[in-house]
């Protein structure tokens, strides 16, 4: 599911070179950063222009359901801006991808928030995800990700940062208590050379059970370190309802 979000995003935000087909300058605007309307082969730009290219504040619209509004530098999305894309895939599902944050050279780069929501033709929301933190070259680098889906378990959580990665699959609510009790559906924890993992399912061998219990004990002992991240997971989970 997480790979699907990344693939969806990369396909959604890729843009061909901005080669203007026609430029109409707004009367009264300065020549250096004139306000203008520019028609492209695949869309329309309205905003500040310099040397015939979007430069400054503006909005680039490909269709009613696909647009970017924010900063441009020499024809590329750079600075702060919001990207919105809603489309129907071959399976009939509606995908809505929104990124609000920093850009550089037409790519997500810097601090931002990415959301991805998928809805069936019946109106049923089958997945809703939010990813927040630092991005670079259209790739999420660090921060928090929460996904809510029609699945079992229905939530997945991930934190990446400061050399630590925490991944949890389970249900939302009382995450810290579940962490302390060692009864989360699945946990993966890595910090440097330390890696701990356990599933809720029974193990098959005595050695596997021993390793599982060792992981649970270790994770219980670092509950205070995990607590801020678990609280952030629960906070973000409120933003991804299946409705």
Regions found by a protein language model. Give the residues of each.
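Sec-dependent N-terminal signal peptides of Gram-positive bacterial secreted proteins and lipoproteins
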Residues: 4-20
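Glycine/tyrosine- and acidic-biased, solvent-exposed loop/turn segments at the edges of beta-strands
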Residues: 21-243
